Amino acid sequence: MSVPPCYDEFMALIDAIRVKVASGDFEYSQHAVDQATLRHIPVQEFREAIANGEVIEDYPNDKYGPSCLVLGFTTAGRPIHIQCSHASRSLIKIITAYQPDPDEWTDFKHRRS
């Protein structure tokens, strides 16, 4: 299996995000707070998912600034998608989070057509 051309870029991106989140340099959008409450995603699960996550989509031209979609798993094995800003911001902005629907995602990484 070949490595996609964006692999190194995605690895550098998640590494930078992990460092900031581990040091507490992140904040939640109001939307993320609302969605985390509705979807029962506690702060610890955000941290766990980012700590072992990978960037699966990149949105360099997102309307509020570059962001990406991270897939990570909690220690309980729960898959979580987290959309967050790139690490170029002083604080990582958590934009939204949800548990991916298997009917919409294959292996939680690739959108079904």
Language model feature labels by segment:
Residues 1-113:
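Ribonuclease/tRNase effector modules and their secretory precursors
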